[in-house]
Amino acid sequence: MSLSHLYRDGEGHMDDDEDERENFEITDWDLQNEFNPNRQRHWQTKEEATYGVWAERDSDEERPSFGGKRARDYSAPVNFISAGLKKGAAEEAELEDSDDEEKPVKQDEFPKDFGPKKLKTGGNFKPSQKGFAGGTKSFMDFGSWERHTKGIGQKLLQKMGYVPGRGLGKNAQGIINPIEAKQRKGKGAVGAYGSERTTQSLQDFPVVDSEEEAEEEFQKELSQWRKDPSGSKKKPKYSYKTVEELKAKGRISKKLTAPQKELSQVKVIDMTGREQKVYYSYSQISHKHSVPDDGLPPQAQPPPPPGKEARAPGFALPELEHNLQLLIELTEQEIIRNDRQLQYERDVVVNLTHELEKASGALQQEQRAIASLSEVLALVEECERRLQPGCSDPLTLDECARVFQTLRDKYYEEYRMSDRVDLAVAIVYPLMKDYFKEWDPLKDCTYGTETISQWKSLLENDQLLSHGGQDLSADAFHRLIWEVWMPFVRSIVAQWQPRNCDPMVDFLDSWAPLIPVWVLDNILEQLIFPKLQKEVESWNPLTDTVPIHSWVHPWLPLMQARLEPLYSPIRSKLASALQKWHPSDSSAKLILQPWKDVFTPGSWEAFMVKNIVPKLGMCLGELVINPHQQHMDAFYWVIDWEGMVSVSSLVGLLEKHFFPKWLQVLCSWLSNSPNYEEITKWYLGWKSMFSDQVLAHPSVKDKFNEALDIMNRAVSSNVGAYMQPGAREHIAYLTHTERRKDFQYEAMQERREAENMAQRGIGVAASAVPMNFKDLIETKAEEHNIVFMPVIGKRHEGKQLYTFGRIVIYIDRGVVFVQGEKTWVPTSLQSLIDMAK
């Protein structure tokens, strides 16, 4: 191994004697600095690359670098290095590594102007940089540099509420003086020279740290087993634990804790003591003795107090300590176990007490239920006994009703939970059959209504009624009506004649609020409608003296849309009867007029256009207009149908069959030197034959205006040598008067419409706010003259059904549903109005 490292300087270079040669041996320094990025390297200069080993070196041309050798300074004093004080290569490399970590780039590799000069150790040179002899400066001049600045930091602190001389924080709780540092005496570890607290720390925190108290307590406990050299016996200090403290702590010893299965066979190596020990489960660790060390190391033992001699450390009894500690822990565990067992037993007592109270309450409730059921059973058995034939005191229907009333009022729970259907079938049904045995509904339609109303409140199932069901096995009242009351109704309807409709209508009107809805529907659809349909098929309008509407229309409030299938055969029979009809026969109007509001507007208009309007047109065609001898019968026959035939159809007849002939007669009359006063009367007479509704039609108005124009042209022309005096003025006055009447009529119509709109607006404003959707439909029905009324006893899914004209609807959450062919279809309000029209 080479000893060249003994002659290296602090920078790792060779001495001056060895400048002329280079040693190629690998030293420890080379190995340790192999991967050191800051190690010194030789950078080949341009001259060395050109001349090789013959290159001359000039100290003036050299420049500082990070890896090359620097020039020798022969003016510096000679420094000798003692071989005995020279550090080893390894220690020197460690020092260099530590220096490299703190300062990767050496200061002497920079130009001379950079930083302080390197401290020299010999000669006449002094250190170029002074050290801090007294540590840090006093804090008296802390922040004095702000004198030479604008003091922005102090200003910002003062704006935020800082007061010079006081601490920081909202309540000035911060420290005022900087934290002082205390220099340790020697090079020992922390705490080796006692407390290191400063005067400032003692002033701010006078309380002794808990660690010092723990250390003192530990030393006292450690010295209890040591013999006092002075011979004085000190009274030992004992710590006592009460039973209440143990209960509050609730500690369970680890010895009672059963080890987990996965941890029971685990190899454990204990290296906490002087020797290595191996355990094969964690439970074995808990059984080892806590053997203390023989004593503290000499350097860790506290020095003896002044005035006393040092004592030898006392002896230790680990087995005795272990046994005593084991007895203490077993006692504590026994106390805790007993306390938990006591608490458990108390909880069991409380739980059993609650269960006993609950069982007692259930027992009392069962006893009350048994007593109530016994009383109910006694009442029922009494009713059954009185129902037996040959009983001296037979049961009546009123007495049975009182028994059921008692059951409902006094024993409501039992009455609600009992099977009322079987009870009613056994007791009530026989009495009810005897009650209606001689009843004739057509003669006395109100017989039994009060009795049925009373039994409805006693037997009807409210839950079933709310769901809209018709389960006969669950509702005693529905079953009573179906099995007892319906047979009498079927027998009466079978003998009833449809043309004698009033008694049957009165009977059903009286019973509709009492009987179930589905029973009423069954009567109307299965019993009444087939009878009416059969009677309509046999009806002959030419031979029957009783009009059909007299025995069909009374069923409209009850059946409503169910009568729609009857309207088509009625219209066909009426149409066949009108084939040979003449407008002079007024009986046709009497027969058809009641059906105008029953048929839909479209079907009624089609019927009139097909069967009536052609007959009226033929009658107008036969009308002869003769101013001197006028026959008005044909005209009266046509005008008499104005309310039955629509205005448009009637105006069409007049335009086609009346006005052409009327204007032709007027022109002929004016061409023969007429008397204009007579023409004026004739004109006004014909105009008075029409109603205001017909005169307001634009076509009729145009025809009469055309007649006025013809008369004006006649009087204004020069045809004829002789002109009646005042004729022109008379015709002009007539024209002006007629035009003014038309204008006044139009103004009056507009004013009337405005008043109606105003009244309608006032009515809407005066109505209840907010107005629901049903009120809105009702208002629209009034505006369009449409009948809107509820269907008595008719519901769909619990919703009330209404008739809107001839349409059946129901309202659900602001939506109108219209009855279609198979399902209910939602529609808008305007579509509903259009369908009703």
UniProtKB/Swiss-Prot annotation:
Coiled-coil region(s): none
Motif range (Nuclear localization signal): 700-705
Domain G-patch: 149-195
One GO cellular component term noted in the UniProt record for this chain: U2-type post-mRNA release spliceosomal complex
Alphabetical keyword list: Biomineralization, Cytoplasm, mRNA processing, mRNA splicing, Nucleus, Phosphoprotein, Spliceosome
Region listing for Disordered, in residue ranges: 1-31, 54-73, 85-136, 183-236, 287-313
Subcellular location: Cytoplasm; Nucleus
Alphabetical GO biological process terms: biomineral tissue development; spliceosomal complex disassembly
Signal sequence region: none
Residues bearing the modification Phosphoserine: S2, S59, S98, S144, S210
Biased composition (Basic and acidic residues): 1-13, 54-64, 103-116, 217-231
Bias type Acidic residues, positions: 14-28, 91-102
Pfam families registered for this protein in UniProt: G-patch, GCFC, TIP_N
Region (Required for interaction with DHX15): 1-50
Positions of region (Required for nuclear speckle localization): 710-734
Function, as annotated: Involved in pre-mRNA splicing, specifically in spliceosome disassembly during late-stage splicing events. Intron turnover seems to proceed through reactions in two lariat-intron associated complexes termed Intron Large (IL) and Intron Small (IS). In cooperation with DHX15 seems to mediate the transition of the U2, U5 and U6 snRNP-containing IL complex to the snRNP-free IS complex leading to efficient debranching and turnover of excised introns. May play a role in the differentiation of ameloblasts and odontoblasts or in the forming of the enamel extracellular matrix.
Family of this protein: Belongs to the TFP11/STIP family.
Quaternary context: Identified in the spliceosome C complex. Found in the Intron Large (IL) complex, a post-mRNA release spliceosomal complex containing the excised intron, U2, U5 and U6 snRNPs, and splicing factors. Interacts with TUFT1. Interacts with DHX15; indicative for a recruitment of DHX15 to the IL complex. Interacts with GCFC2.
Protein name: Tuftelin-interacting protein 11
Organism this protein belongs to: Bos taurus (Bovine)
Taxonomic lineage from the root: Eukaryota, Metazoa, Chordata, Craniata, Vertebrata
Record gene name: TFIP11
